[in-house]
Amino acid sequence: MSFPNSSPAANTFLVDSLIGACRTDFYSSSNMYMPAATAEMGTYGMQTCGLLPALGKRGEVNHQNMDMTVHSYIPQTDTWADPSRSCRLEQPLNQMSTCTFSQSIKEETNCCMYSDKRAKVSSSEIPAYSSLIPESCSVDSPEIPVPGYFRLSQTYATAKNPDYDNETMSPNTTLMQLNRATPKAQSTPFVEVEKKLAHDRDTRSSSPAQSPEPKVSTLEEKNCSTEASVSSPELPHREGKESKNDTPTSNWLTAKSGRKKRCPYTKHQTLELEKEFLFNMYLTRERRLEISKSVNLTDRQVKIWFQNRRMKLKKMSRENRIRELTSNLTFS
């Protein structure tokens, strides 16, 4: 079929034109009146909406399927399908061969202007429907206009397009504003950090110049601590306790079950005491004083360590003796 490009009905079939025609032009008492300009438009809209079946061959009209009494909202449609009317569509044979539609096709396969009900047209179906799809109903268009009585007027479409453009541009503008605002928000912490660093440097540079006396006092305290460590042998004992608390993962400080051993002695001190215990389990007072000086422990600490070591040896020997006795016994 061919429409003149100048007429507005060539591209879209408008709702308001159909309503106005149905009220005034199409009906006069019981007879139907259709002008020559709107005759082709009416039959084209009825065919695309599924009200009239498609023509199978050129010049053939199925009179049984042309009965349109099912649609109660369009009266006197039987006269539209009269073959003697001048509104019959004559289409070329090569176009109508690809446009044969079965009666089982649902109305939902038509174009819809609502985004959630768009028809998903595949690449294989495009050439078959290309002859019936108007120019305004393109596949790639974001909103596909509805054929027939669902189409809106061009004035509404032109009025809606600026709003849609404004809505699409608004997210971009907001993103640009956010992008402009974020560098400021990010730059403020860096400026604050730089100010703090500069302030700390100033305070550090001013503090040595203002207070040279605390340095002298700290040196005196260090000297006193070294003298006290030489005079009193109990300080290494305390330092050994602190070092043990700092390193609880060492094997000689933890038991097999993971329990922390109560060991106030350093590893070097325990090794020296163990070597002396191998040579002699009982020490004289003179030898005990010598060992205490070499290991930086008091005489009493060395005495207690040897007592505990003898008790440990006694316990281990008892356990070994019991184990040997029980291993020789056989239970029947």
Swiss-Prot record:
The keyword DNA-binding applies. InterPro entries: HD, HD_metazoa, Homeobox_CS, Homeodomain-like_sf, HXA10/ABDB-like. Residues 258-317 bind DNA. Residues 194-261 are annotated as: Disordered. Its main location: nucleus. It is found in: Nucleus. GO terms for molecular function: DNA-binding transcription factor activity, RNA polymerase II-specific; RNA polymerase II cis-regulatory region sequence-specific DNA binding. GO terms for cellular component: nucleus. Keywords: Developmental protein, DNA-binding, Homeobox, Nucleus, Transcription, Transcription regulation. CDD domains: homeodomain (cd00086). It holds the Pfam family Homeodomain. One of its GO terms (biological process) is regulation of transcription by RNA polymerase II. Residues 194-204, 235-245 have a biased composition (Basic and acidic residues). Belongs to the Abd-B homeobox family. Sequence-specific transcription factor which is part of a developmental regulatory system that provides cells with specific positional identities on the anterior-posterior axis. This is Homeobox protein Hox-D10a.
